[in-house]
Structure formats: C-alpha cells, structure tokens
C-alpha cells in the first residue's frame, strides 16, 4: 500500500466537497445544516492554502483518492495544533490507513512545534470515537459552540 499525502489542488475541489459532505453525515447522521456549513468553503480553502500553518491534504493510496485532512499548527492554546477534519472514504475505513494518517498529523504538527493536538468530534460518531480512544486521544470537555460535540486532545510524541 503506497500512501501519498499531497496538498489539496483546488482543481480537485469537488473531492473536498464530497469528503466534507460524507464527513458531515458520519458526524451527525443527517445533512441538515450542511448547506450553511459549506457556504464559503472554497474561499476559506483558497485563503488557508496561502496561509502558513494551515494544512489541507488529500490522501492517495496506490494513486486512488482515499481521504482528506484539514488541520493547523496553531490555536488559542500555546503549542497546540487543531484538527478540523480527518476523513477517509468508506472503502478505506478499517484498512489500517487511519493510524498512518494519525502518524502523518502527529509528525507534521510536531515539526511545526506543537506538543499537543485538539479536535472536536460528534458524540454520535462512534467509529471515530472508538479510533480516537484506542489511539491516545483523551476527552477534554464539551464543545460550548456545538451541543453534539466534545473536545479531545492528543499529546504528541517528542
């Protein structure tokens, strides 16, 4: 299995929207609110691709699109990166790819000077929660901005 991590090419923007839409459904079990969520997404991606510290990555396995990452090496908390999206297409879930994706995030954030990563995950996304708990992520607190999600943290290996 040859895994390649490549910065998102905006010419492949439809892959970004497809990934975000499926991730939204995995998180919440419905598409209600997705149109509002995705509004302005292309502009945000373009802006962030040009901004240091942002990582918008497409994952390919043996040349086939397998998933998408969105994360940054800064947050309001010192030495802390924030993960906005870890997405794998359904046919790559359970394939052993997810731990390698986490290793990529950890390596990238560590090189950027982060000691910790934080993400917000839906309480109903049981598959993601199971993975996070098995791979070192710890519950931090409820997300005050979203009733259905909680913050988890991962201390990065140094």
Question: What does each model-found stretch correspond to?
Answer:
Residues 108-109, 137:
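Tryptophan-centered motif/residue detector
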Residues 48-53, 105, 114-119, 130-132:
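A general structural signal for short secondary-structure boundary/capping elements
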Residues 35, 95, 117-118:
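A generic secondary-structure micro-motif detector
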Residues 89-103, 112, 123-130, 134-135:
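Conserved glycine-rich acetyl-CoA-binding loop
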Residues 3-85, 89-91, 102-104, 108, ...:
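Acetyl-CoA-dependent GNAT
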Residues 115-118, 122-126, 134-158:
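C-terminal "cap" of GNAT-fold acetyltransferases
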């Amino acid at each position: 299995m040859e895994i390649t991590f490549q910065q998102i090419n905006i010419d492949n923007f439809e892959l970004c929207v497809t990934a975000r839409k499926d991730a939204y459904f995995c998180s919440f079990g419905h598409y209600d609110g997705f149109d509002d969520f995705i509004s302005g997404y292309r502009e945000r991606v373009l802006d962030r691709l040009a901004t240091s510290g942002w990582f918008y990555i497409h994952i390919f396995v043996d040349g086939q699109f397998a998933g998408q990452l969105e994360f940054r090496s800064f947050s309001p908390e010192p030495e802390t990166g924030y993960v906005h999206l870890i997405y794998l297409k359904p046919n790559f879930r359970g394939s052993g790819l997810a731990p390698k994706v986490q290793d990529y995030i950890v390596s990238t954030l560590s090189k950027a000077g982060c000691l910790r990563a934080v993400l917000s995950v839906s309480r109903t996304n049981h598959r993601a929660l199971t993975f996070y708990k098995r791979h070192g992520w710890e519950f931090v607190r409820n997300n005050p901005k979203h009733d259905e999600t909680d913050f988890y943290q991962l201390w990065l290996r140094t």
